[in-house]
């Protein structure tokens, strides 16, 4: 009889400088619940990312046998399904993570499939994968980040209201941009939108090519304004209709970011990008080539299985400004268009205690084939959700409460931080065993109905 396709996973955690420190880090706490014998949380060490998947940089292991999940799915293709295995080279198509963010991650974008192949061939050390990396972020705790270019009217406002920004991009570049997009900032005509994107590209490139000396001088002035006049920061009496509603908050973030990365171009990129705040359970989706930066919070992140990053600010790591300014799409849109609204998940059945306690199964389903995520909240002891088998693999992590997970004849206890792999086509039942809400996130790949989505598009 084949083994039951339910594996408890041991997952590794990365210690990047931006991670939350010691026991403050959800990534560290979750890793510690199923840790290797040589792992213990150090109180002064940052812990940034818990990785769940088959990516070779930090592969998850089966707790019982200590074999990597990659080995196991390559030995037994049925665990991820023949179709998924053939399409994704015998590996999980997604990488599931928990990020615990204390200070800003780099301003970055992830190359699309075509560019990823080119960058990997040219520079495999800095670009270790040939795959694209669209990704989705779901907040576990309140989250702040930057995501995609702002609407053009907002960028124009900041060019007028933030003197050090205008000084840095240069009067000529600022005026040319304003004159090009004036009166057509919100046009939906494709030809006009394309013209606006090219104007934004020119302006942004001008900013990104600023000299270190001019960045330092402009930053000094910017921070002084933020500290001395927080209530009127980034506002203008001549254009009150476009003033931000939260000037003091923007001033505080400007000071905080400069404290983390002194004299960094990122403090000015901030005025080009949407400032996004997510409450727990809210999500955003980033297409390949979308510019973004995370600032603070604990999040669940799911992405196509790639570790490619093109960085250009808020980082001590390799910066590739030329590639970044060339690769971006320069699409601009309000925050609402970056957020991803979940819907009810139709392939799970809740029992009576689950229904009567207001338990829920909601689906975050981005417009790509590699992954979707279901968040389940079971709000009473004995509340149960039965998930239909799907024709692809799943990884489940518990972020709150206690319960159990059952696949076939096998039942495992589940506590906060526990991670499980569920094989393709297996019905999966989760049940709350405590009084507190039992919360799980389940990342999965099911190609059914996604035949029209071509990899990389």
Curated annotation (Swiss-Prot):
Pathway(s) where this gene product acts: Nucleotide-sugar biosynthesis; GDP-alpha-D-mannose biosynthesis; alpha-D-mannose 1-phosphate from D-fructose 6-phosphate: step 1/2
Database matches in InterPro entries: Man6P_Isoase-1, Mannose-6-P_Isomerase, Pmannose_isomerase-type1_CS, PMI_typeI_C, PMI_typeI_cat, PMI_typeI_hel, RmlC-like_jellyroll, RmlC_Cupin_sf
Catalytic activity of the protein: D-mannose 6-phosphate = D-fructose 6-phosphate
Positions annotated to bind Zn(2+): 108, 110, 135, 292
Keyword Metal-binding: yes
Signal peptide: none
A GO term for molecular function: zinc ion binding
Enzyme Commission numbers on file: 5.3.1.8
PROSITE patterns tied to this protein: PMI_I_1, PMI_I_2
Alphabetical GO biological process terms: cell wall mannoprotein biosynthetic process; GDP-mannose biosynthetic process; mannose metabolic process; protein glycosylation
Matches recorded under Gene3D superfamilies: Jelly Rolls, Phosphomannose Isomerase, domain 2
Active site: 311
Superkingdom classification of source: Eukaryota
Record's subcellular location: Cytoplasm
Cofactors demanded by this protein: Zn(2+)
GO cellular component terms, semicolon-separated: cytosol
Keywords in alphabetical order: Cytoplasm, Isomerase, Metal-binding, Zinc
A Pfam family hit: PMI_typeI_hel
Family designation: Belongs to the mannose-6-phosphate isomerase type 1 family.
Function in brief: Involved in the synthesis of the GDP-mannose and dolichol-phosphate-mannose required for a number of critical mannosyl transfer reactions.
Name of this protein: Mannose-6-phosphate isomerase
Lineage: Eukaryota, Fungi, Dikarya, Ascomycota, Pezizomycotina
Gene this protein is translated from: pmi1
